[in-house]
């Protein structure tokens, strides 16, 4: 939620006429997007769960991934990213947010098989919102853990819902497909239940801009 908090602080500081504070928080707000875009895969838009300021592997800092996979994969920490960026887009109309959401929505809609960009770099599509699973490497390849049946297999609301919200930056037809899929899912755990509620509030227009 960092970018939303920073945006709200920005608006309040501007209204107060505190230009020094406004400049400080404005830089912080855009730095969040800078880090996000440095780390995001150039085609899929998928991001690490944890990264450093330059969008690279984290060093000399603490990160906890034992409950959901590796720091450099799109797992249960990272899956919240499209939801957060969607909130910035629908509340404030941020163009960087829109562009990012459109990129990650293209990943969701792309065929699931291996594909290559103009430089010969391999990547994989999500296969449509109905085929989204609960763990990926950032190039779109499913991250399947053979010792734990959940990862890379479950059609989990934590992932599906966040991607569904990202569709709000695309077109109505895609939104309808994604939201219909979201409406069919039930959460199995506390974490997913919490995210499912938050996703549904935003999808239904009940997660209001506080300003």
Regions found by a protein language model. Give the residues of each.
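Terminal, non-catalytic domain-edge segments
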Residues: 82-91, 162, 166-211
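Extended ligand-binding clefts on enzyme/binding-domain cores
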Residues: 1-161, 165-170
